[in-house]
Amino acid sequence: MLVLAGDIGGTNTRLCLVETDGKNESTLREEIYPSGNEGLVPLVRQFLGDECNVYKACFALAGPVLNNKCKITNLPWPELDAAKLQEELNIAKVSLINDFVAIGYNIVLEKNKSLVTLQEGEFLPDAPIAIIGAGTGLGKAFAVPEGDSYRVFPTEGGHESFAPDNLLAQELLAYLRADGKVDVERVVSGPGIVDIFRFLQDHKFPSEDAGDFLSQSDPGAAIAKGAAAGHFLCQQTMAIFVEAFGAAAGDMAVSFLPFGGLYIAGGIAAQNIELMQNGNFIKAFTDKARVNPVLLEKVPVHIVLNTLEGLRGAVKYAATKM
């Protein structure tokens, strides 16, 4: 069976063509495109070319999916509708799923995971699993056992209110409020890294060398690399980011008690392992006011190293759930 899978984010669209029998997969072709302003259909047509034997397609999208329809959060595309995509692309079955649902399915169905463990915890096989990841935005999902597998559910938890409990982060919150209500994604994301840097540059360390990080094509990634190279403002920026990320993950852990594991997806964590391992993430993760930290110390916490989890999850969903 020929399956088309896509992972559509605010920055890039990844597409792949896979031959699968539901258990084994053979990737025939894989491409990455800038998401841009054209919409999904032109990108898929460009990718498929003359290929007309695709039976199923599953697209993982960075936004809420309701009734197989989705308006992607960080893209100017019109709403995507699976029924219309079936007609326009001449594909028999099309499903739209949240990108973190796709990531979740790949995590629960993939036997050979590539992980870095931040906290061993005490794994419980029948407990929920939580997934959180920062990139262009902040995504969250959770999974619960169902038979001999799991069922994955989406959330829009990245849009929870940012509620810091230390003075510096509260000053950051006040700074960001100039542009309206502040959700966690405004801080824990690639654009969030840039905003933290600007806050420190403008309000805390105006005499420090700011370098040319903000003029780079991906300033968030440039700032993270600057931190690794010892640049002061970048180091301070990433310290705030990692603490906020840990706190957001801890909030999720308090809600779901994911003793089946909390998995950190997305390129930012995978590309900044040393920053994630320095102890500040886990310290913020377990520091939850009236919640005994011993409880959250029992949650296994892992970084997922494969940054194509969403794409592979869309393949698995098409092969096993459609």
Give, region by region, the residue ranges found by the protein language model.
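Glycine-rich phosphate-binding loop of actin/hexokinase-like ATP-binding domains
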Residues: 117-120, 125-185, 274, 280-296
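Short glycine-aspartate micro-motif
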Residues: 3-7, 56-58, 95, 129-133, ...
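Short, acidic Gly/Pro/Ser/Thr-rich loop/turn segments
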Residues: 13, 64-66, 137-141, 195, ...
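Short beta-strand-loop/turn "lid" adjacent to the catalytic site in phosphate-handling enzymes
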Residues: 49-96, 101-114, 131, 270-274
